[in-house]
């Protein structure tokens, strides 16, 4: 274990090979950690390095940046692969006014705080590059928008930490709820080795019921620190949250074998706490993982940092996917396992288990059902989602592994085929009779699940091999044929039943099932496997490189499908020709019915095509008209007005109309007034003329008062020559004016005596 140092100025001189240089003259310094020792804290070591511009503290165990504020000229700071725990430590870099480049990758703060990058960009305004990525202007705006509501208050960091903790707690609660849903639905977790394409299902019931597994011999005490023997990324992350932050050797990137592949589930394994870790055969002999895991096929499943369960899944060169029955506890795991993989013992001697493997101590299960077991094909059919591209990809990878590892040796394959054919020919009714409704009632249960017994491993093998087909369609097709057979030929009483091989042999005579004999298929299988291995060697580029390689997946799928649906050959002689004839007749009737429906469909499609073409023509004409109208409007300079503009203009015109209406009313009143004035003027003129005429008619010696007494003047005023009483009634002003004029005339006339 590397030593942990608290840095001081003397340590800086020793590590940086500074002998006679003054601290003020140092501009660049590299203090990377090594296996000899790692820096734990910096303290006041940089108090005198005022002109330091570049500092490299990568690959250390620094947990606090207290004391970094003395580097007032620092521009480039590398804290790669340290143990900076929180944003509070990142905020200690704020007093550095010239900091332009910062590297905090592989620190806990990067994994735990989702807003870490935004916080760093918001806090360090002069930052130009963060974690070897240029800080974009959009990130600055996003950070400012995200943290603007907190402002520059004193509780800024507390509020940021609080929001981060709330997000973490929310994720934990979501993880617990999802874990409970998984256990309630009795769904299996699937972990896949990216090197092998191996599916390993974990039934939740067995995981929940199992208490613990004894520790392997020779690996020390159970309370040994997890940092010495890492069990995988997820185990270390769980342990990091629960153990003190100064235990830094347990980091997921430290002491990690380059040949060890750690596989993550498509879902977030952080919430569930399950992890599968595989170790390659070529790992270093001095690595501690080899002492803990002596066999390459042991995986560790962890739900807690202190609890692990080891399951032996057999030799990696011959293992194929297998699922424990949902009702079988882990106490019967060895028996089920030995029954399923019993054929491996006949093909080649399986290496004995290491003494490090201990027996399981688990609670007994009261409802054990050992009469049925699920094959890999059933498992993949039930667990993989056909609508998901990821599920199809993983299923293809699993089938690839099963085919390459089980059929990789042509000589072994020939031996297996011969044994299978012999076992099918020698199959007798001693296995027991099965009612017809046992198969017809449940088509999803394959026929092989009704014939499993501890002494018939070959029989299980033929059906297990058939279930390993990479095409779920082909698998269901064969099972449906088995279920639709006339079961009276295969399941009768022990006295009059025929061998099952005759029923299976009749399958080759059915329409669409042209599987050649085993002796004819063997060279084809060997050729396909050889081509598949060459394809793997061609495209292999490290762990998991084949899972998303389309150049590999396409040809591999075609090769595997050629095993399931081989080239048609001459059909075998069937033992039941009447069944074959019935099948052909049914097929012929179906084809005739389909042929009758085809013309009707063609007519309807033609009619639809005609309607679509007509609609297309109409729409094209409308588009042409619209284009012409738009061109004309552009040429004439007319600009289309929007609805808002038209509404605004309408309001303006309405106001103008109202104003004009008011002005019109005023003009009408003015016209009435002018008409009244004109009438008054005419009355005055007439009255004046009449009075002048009267004055001219009167004798000179006659008195004016006698000539025009008030009564007479009043009478004259009432009897106008025009028949209007203008002086007396309609115009008082004119009446007074007339009197004034008459009086003036009388005054101006000379007296007769004078």
From Swiss-Prot:
Intervals holding LRR repeats: 51-72, 73-94
InterPro entries: CEP72-like, Leu-rich_rpt, LRR_dom_sf
Ranges of biased composition (kind: Basic and acidic residues): 241-255
Regions annotated as coiled coil: 600-680
Cell membrane is among the record's keywords: no
Domain of life the protein comes from: Eukaryota
Stretches assigned to the LRRCT domain: 107-146
Biased composition (Polar residues): 722-732
Annotated stretches, region: Disordered: 241-270, 702-734
Keyword terms of this UniProt record: Coiled coil, Leucine-rich repeat, Repeat
Matches recorded under PANTHER family: HEAT SHOCK REGULATED 2 (PTHR23311), LEUCINE-RICH REPEAT-CONTAINING PROTEIN 36 (PTHR23311:SF6)
Protein name: Leucine-rich repeat-containing protein 36
């Amino acid at each position: 274990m590397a030593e942990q140092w608290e840095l001081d100025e003397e340590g800086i001189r020793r590590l940086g090979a500074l002998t006679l240089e003054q601290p003020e003259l140092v501009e660049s310094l590299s203090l990377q950690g090594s296996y000899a020792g790692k820096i734990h804290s910096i303290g006041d070591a940089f108090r005198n390095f005022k002109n330091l511009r570049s500092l490299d503290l990568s690959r250390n165990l620094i947990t606090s940046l207290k004391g970094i504020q003395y580097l007032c000229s620092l521009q480039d700071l590398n804290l790669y692969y340290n143990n900076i725990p929180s944003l509070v430590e990142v905020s200690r870099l704020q007093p550095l006014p010239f900091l332009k480049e910062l590297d905090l990758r592989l620190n806990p703060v990067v994994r735990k705080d989702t807003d870490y990058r935004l916080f760093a960009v918001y806090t360090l305004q002069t930052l130009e590059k963060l974690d070897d990525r240029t800080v974009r202007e959009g990130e600055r705006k996003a950070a400012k928008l995200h943290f603007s509501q907190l402002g520059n208050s004193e509780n800024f960091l507390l509020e940021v930490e609080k929001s981060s903790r709330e997000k973490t707690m929310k994720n934990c609660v979501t993880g617990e709820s999802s874990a409970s849903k998984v256990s309630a639905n009795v769904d299996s977790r699937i972990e896949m080795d990216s090197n092998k394409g191996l599916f390993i299902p974990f039934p939740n019931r067995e995981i929940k019921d199992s208490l613990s597994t004894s520790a392997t011999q020779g690996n020390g005490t159970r309370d040994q620190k997890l940092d010495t023997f890492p069990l995988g990324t997820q185990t270390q992350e769980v342990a990091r949250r629960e153990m003190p932050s100064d235990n830094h050797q347990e980091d997921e990137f430290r002491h990690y074998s380059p040949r060890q592949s750690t596989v993550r589930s498509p879902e977030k394994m952080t919430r569930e706490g399950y992890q599968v870790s595989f170790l390659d055969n070529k790992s270093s002999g001095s690595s501690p993982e080899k002492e803990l895991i002596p066999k390459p096929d042991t995986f560790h499943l962890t739900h807690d940092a202190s609890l692990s369960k080891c399951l032996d899944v057999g030799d990696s060169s011959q293992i194929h996917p297998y699922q424990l029955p949902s009702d079988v506890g882990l106490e019967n795991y060895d028996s089920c396992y030995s029954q399923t993989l019993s054929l491996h013992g006949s093909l080649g001697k399986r290496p004995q288990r290491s003494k490090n493997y201990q027996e399981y101590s688990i609670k007994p299960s009261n409802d054990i059902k050992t009469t049925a077991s699920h094959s890999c094909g059933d498992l993949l059919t039930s667990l993989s989602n056909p609508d998901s591209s990821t599920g199809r990809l993983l299923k293809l990878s699993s089938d690839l592994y099963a085919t390459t590892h089980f059929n990789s040796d042509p000589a072994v394959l020939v031996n297996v085929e011969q044994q299978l054919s012999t076992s099918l020919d020698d199959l007798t009714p001693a296995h027991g009779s099965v009612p017809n409704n046992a198969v017809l009632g449940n088509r999803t249960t394959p026929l092989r699940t009704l014939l499993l017994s501890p002494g018939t491993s070959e029989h299980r093998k033929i059906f297990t091999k058939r279930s390993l087909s990479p095409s779920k369609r082909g698998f269901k097709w064969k099972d449906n044929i088995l279920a639709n057979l006339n079961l009276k030929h295969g399941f009768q009483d022990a006295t009059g039943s025929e061998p099952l091989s005759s029923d299976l042999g009749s399958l080759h005579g059915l329409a669409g099932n042209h599987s050649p004999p085993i002796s004819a298929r063997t060279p084809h299988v060997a050729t396909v496997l050889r081509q598949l291995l060459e394809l793997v060697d061609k495209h292999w580029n490290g762990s998991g490189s084949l899972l998303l390689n389309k150049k590999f997946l396409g040809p591999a799928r075609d090769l595997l499908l050629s095993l399931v649906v081989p080239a048609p050959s001459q059909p075998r002689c069937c033992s039941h020709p009447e069944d074959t004839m019935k099948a052909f007749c049914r097929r012929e009737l179906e084809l005739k019915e389909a042929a009758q429906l085809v013309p009707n469909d063609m007519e309807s499609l033609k009619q639809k095509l005609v309607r679509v073409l007509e609609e297309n023509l109409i729409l094209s004409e409308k588009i042409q008209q619209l284009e012409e109208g738009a061109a004309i409007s552009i040429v004439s300079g007319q600009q289309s007005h929007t609805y808002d503009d038209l509404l605004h203009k309408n309001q303006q015109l309405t106001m103008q109309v109202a104003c004009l209406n008011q002005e019109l009313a005023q003009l009408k009143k003015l016209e009435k007034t002018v008409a009244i004035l004109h009438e008054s003027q005419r009355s005055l003129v007439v009255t004046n003329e009449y009075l002048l005429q009267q004055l001219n008619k009167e004798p000179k010696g006659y008195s004016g008062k006698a000539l025009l007494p008030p009564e007479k003047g009043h009478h004259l005023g009432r009897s106008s020559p025009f028949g209007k009483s203008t002086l007396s009634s309609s115009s008082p002003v004119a009446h007074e004016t007339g009197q004034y004029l008459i009086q003036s005339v009388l005054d101006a006339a000379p007296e007769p005596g004078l």
